[in-house]
Amino acid sequence: MDFKISLKFQPTGDQPEAIRQLTDGVMNGEHAQVLLGVTGSGKTFTMANVIANVGRPTLILSHNKTLAAQLYEEMKSFFPDNAVEYYVSYYDYYQPEAYLPSSDTYIEKDLAINEDIDKLRLSAVSALLSGRKDVVVVSSVSCIYGMGGPTAMANSVISVKRGETVERNAFLRKLVDALYLRNDIDLTRGTFRVKGDTVDVFMAYSDNVLRITWWDDEIDSIEEVDSVTFQRIAEFADYKIYPANLFVTSKEQTESAIRLIQDDLLKQIDFFESVGDHIRSQRIKERVEYDMEMIKELGHCSGIENYSRYFDGREPGQRPYCLLDFFPKDFLMFIDESHVSVPQISAMYGGDRARKQNLVEYGFRLPAAFDNRPLKFDEFMDMVNQVVYVSATPADFELEEAGGVVVEQIIRPTGLLDPIIEVRPSENQIDDLFEEIVQCREHDSRVLVTTLTKRMAEELTEYLLAHDVRANYIHSDVATLDRVKIMNDLRAGMYDVLVGVNLLREGLDLPEVSLVAILDADKEGFLRSHRSLTQTAGRAARNVNGKVIMYADKITDSMQRTIDETARRRQLQLKYNADHGIVPQQIRKDIKGALSGFMDSVKSTENSAPVSTSQPRPTSTSYRPYIEPEPTAFAADPVVKRMTRKQLEKSIADTTELMKAAAKNLDFLQAAQYRDEIVRLQDELKLKE
């Protein structure tokens, strides 16, 4: 099936020329190109048109899950009849396995998987396995992390055809091999049930159930039914069922893997014995033998990903399989906000290697654990066929890669201009900011404020709430899907102000924002570099009254470059508007998106609680954001014995948040202490039953 783009508007401004140049470049075999487009110029729209023109499976890589979600929503609206997929990390919480030699502390892996994102990941891989050409996958850097190989996945695809003779039990064995679980009582995603001659399969990548009925050994009907009402939705002559997990293996591969693990275990034991380290020798022996026994009996073990090389049949040091392996060789890639995404890709391998070094060195893992890793940067680049780097501020690497093939997109279809930038003294910056917020609120527009630290963002939010301003914050401690919800609530008018650190930058599409305030703009560094300031200022470029205020006591080189470049672009835009009789038009954009369906089911944390626009603005007593408290050893407190069930549940929830925050800050020792507190509190809660 070809790409069928849904266009509410026709390309205007710089877009037609940018689309033509990029399409010609891809068709002529250009390996790399740069799309240098200002904020609000419609880069995503240009990308969609190029995808439709080229007609190849496409990967769009974004540097964080929030922007990936936004891109996914937009691409879904452009290609409603094609396969637009979403592939990001499915962890709501992830504490990696670690060992701290200084305190001789081993911390076990702990995680929480988001089932909705897991479904979308499986859907993305299934679409690629199907061989469709009209596939767009929007991904975070997760696409370079290890997963099962395409051959193993393809071999596990189950094809069924009406009228085909298939023994039912043979079909059930195939389902089990594809990692579906039998559950005749509670049919959930990734399970199947059998009732007489009918088999219901709740596909792992779908919201619906596939119902297959037999007449003797012949397949009589294949239907898709609603997972709740079981009403028929569609009927098929044939159908393909894709695996329920991204890591599929056969019995033969498992047996081979166990033999290889055993061989490497003996080598590692001999190594530790040769250097006289009997403790590490005994440790690796006990741990690996236990894992092998679990794999033999159950087919899996905790940390089985550290043995992935054996199951995949890879040699030591050979790169793992990843999402890129599922694309055809002629696929097209867009790297959005490339000035941030490219460095992120290059940094992933080093961080992973550093953490595992201690685990291998001290006998917790075999050296094969090193091969369960993200791609190295050169491995990633070797897999790229043709790429378009997309950024308002491309870095030197992208410009060099493109060899001068740079397509500029300065003019906005709406006629909107780059925002006016003002520099004001940092003295009394909060009072001055408050006055600006009041003015914006009177005009029913929103405000973004960027600070230098998460603590500053939280405290400023608390201050604004205390002064009757509907405010919230987002930073790395806020759950991914909650960030999207908070930004949608800002657009809907539930908040007046959104405070952030490094998330209020690339790609955020918030046309209701008329003011961007940058606190401490003269503090040179990563968050106040030329590119960072330009990107942050760009958040005001989607509003007809857009303005940027930099609070600073001096004008740094980065500030001056941003001011000069913004002024240059503004002059070009003014001239274009005058020549073509264009009056700037405010952007109007729907708020609800493709991710909203499953976001509604995600438990909302306190700092994403919506504020009804029909109610009076909350004060600090009626609504306060979550400010991280000092750690408290709840379970060690004698008061715990007198706590009610509700109080215990709240303490467990609070401690869980602290554990997640500690893990994100790589304070694994503290996170483990919180985990132990949670276990003790849960034990106390059971006694209350």
Name these PLM-found stretches.
Residues N28-V34, R56-P57, K133-V135, S445-R446:
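Pre-Walker A (Motif I) flank of P-loop NTPase domains
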Residues V34, Y87-D432, E436-E442, T461, ...:
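N-terminal cationic and glycine-rich segments that engage phosphates or anionic surfaces
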Residues V478-G500:
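Conserved helicase ATPase core of P-loop NTP-dependent helicases/translocases
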